[in-house]
């Protein structure tokens, strides 16, 4: 409802040092104790933002994290996944296969890890480091993957990203949502999310 508090992780919840300020932390904890629902929302995977929920004492007082651009919502106090939108496993495999020869780094965030089919030049390791998750490099990922993806994250330099992104768009735009989220990131999500 109108009394609920929603905070995006990137740019609004965190200060320039990528931390929650004491003032913000105290205001949000007070709001939770007063009965307001507080949600931390991010395009990142749920596991990559749970450390923020811990700092806001969601595990004690309650609160939700919304990852993957709303594709997965988790109640931190109970551990329950309330909502989970994925692309089916066949589509997940098709995107992996199609993207393998493109000049772009491919990442699939899942349960505290980032899966990729080859070590990237820069972005895959950087993304894993930022989130504090492990990087799983599996050259035969298309055949080995056993879960449907919540999201694909593709990365490349700003000068080179548009060509492979356009090929992905042309191939999969009818069955997925796609967005260039930064100058160097291109995302593919289940239809209906953005």
Regions found by a protein language model. Name each.
Residues 98, 104-194:
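Conserved acidic, metal-coordinating active-site core of Asp-based
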Residues 1-6:
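Short, small-residue-biased leader/transition segments that mark boundaries at the very start
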Residues 8, 68, 155:
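Conserved residues at the C-terminal ends of beta-strands
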Residues 16-20:
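Conserved ATPase-coupling elements of RecA-like P-loop NTPase cores
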Residues 7, 15:
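N-terminal G-site helix/loop of the GST-like fold
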Residues 14, 50, 165:
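A short local structural element in Rossmann-fold oxidoreductases
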Residues 22-123:
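Active-site phosphate-binding/coordination module
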């Amino acid at each position: 409802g109108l009394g609920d508090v929603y905070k995006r992780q990137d740019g609004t919840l965190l200060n320039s040092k990528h931390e929650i300020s004491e003032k913000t932390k105290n205001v949000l904890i007070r709001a939770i104790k007063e009965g307001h629902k507080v949600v931390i929302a991010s395009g990142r995977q749920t596991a990559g933002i749970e450390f923020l929920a811990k700092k806001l004492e969601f595990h004690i007082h309650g609160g939700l994290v919304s990852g993957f651009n709303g594709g997965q919502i988790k109640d931190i106090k109970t551990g329950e996944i309330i909502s989970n939108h994925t692309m089916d496993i066949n589509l997940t495999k098709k995107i992996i296969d199609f993207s393998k020869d493109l000049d772009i780094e491919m990442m699939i965030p899942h349960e505290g890890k980032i899966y990729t089919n080859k070590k990237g030049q820069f972005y895959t390791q950087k993304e894993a480091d930022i989130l504090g998750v492990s990087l799983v490099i599996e050259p035969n990922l298309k055949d080995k993957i056993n879960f449907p993806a919540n999201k694909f994250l593709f990365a490349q330099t700003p000068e080179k990203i548009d060509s492979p992104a356009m090929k992905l768009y042309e191939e999969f735009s009818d069955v997925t949502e796609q967005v260039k989220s930064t100058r160097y990131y291109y995302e593919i999500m289940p239809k209906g999310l953005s």
